[in-house]
Regions:
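C-terminal outer-membrane/trafficking sorting elements
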Residues: 170-202
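A short, polar beta-strand/turn micro-motif
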Residues: 1-51, 68-172
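N-terminal post-signal-peptidase region of extra-cytosolic proteins
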Residues: 64-66
Length: 202
């Protein structure tokens, strides 16, 4: 294929692998200092070809989600990025991999999940979803994850309401919502407040 254009928030699927001479991911990333965005792409590249710092999910310890600096960007693997350019990805002559059924980096009961299709999610007694918005992950009772974006999924009935986020050992924010006195603010996956101070069980 001479060129491949990936349109942000629009579905993508590659039934089989192919090579593209040029790739354009049509998305404007924020270049605000320390602004964290999420992404998943269908091709690999060197981190030296990315304008910004890329981080991959590493572990969850003591209610803290740890991400570490990535040494490479793998196809179909979810990442976080602190971009230094609006279009931080430059790639030519890339192999676009076939789209897998699942795109997850798993550690214990937690997974960093990516998608190329719009996904409707509902947190319940066994699964809790955290969507990334406005510089932090927020707990979502219900929400929509758009193509080329990522989220955190906890398959643990004891998933906490809040989780600290660390990038290379540095705390950057809070994952989740305040659950003071058993009440929580309910957000959707875009970080918009849906209901304020409702019972945590609802």
């Amino acid at each position: 294929v001479a060129s491949l254009k990936l349109t942000d928030a629009q579905p993508f699927n590659a039934p089989t692998a192919f090579t593209a001479t040029t790739v354009n991911y049509d998305r404007a990333f924020s270049t605000e200092a320390n602004y964290i965005s999420s992404f998943v792409l269908p091709y690999s590249m060197n981190v030296s070809d990315v304008q910004g710092e890329v981080y991959e999910f590493a572990s969850v310890e003591a209610n803290t989600i740890n991400f570490k600096k990535a040494t490479t960007v793998e196809a179909n693997k979810p990442y976080l990025i602190v971009a230094t350019a609006a279009n931080p990805f430059k790639a030519t002559n890339v192999k676009v991999e076939a789209t897998p059924a699942v795109m997850e980096t798993v550690n214990g009961d937690y997974a960093h999940v990516g998608t190329y299709t719009k996904q409707e999610v509902i947190s319940d007694a066994t699964t809790t979803y955290y969507g990334y918005a406005n510089g932090q992950f927020v707990k979502a009772n219900t929400g929509t994850l758009n193509p080329f974006r990522t989220m955190i999924k906890a398959t643990n009935t004891a998933a906490p309401a809040t989780l600290s986020l660390k990038l290379d050992g540095e705390v950057t924010g809070i994952v989740g919502v305040n659950s003071e006195l058993g009440k929580v603010n309910v957000y959707n996956l875009e970080g918009k407040l849906v209901r304020s101070q409702v019972a945590a069980a609802t």
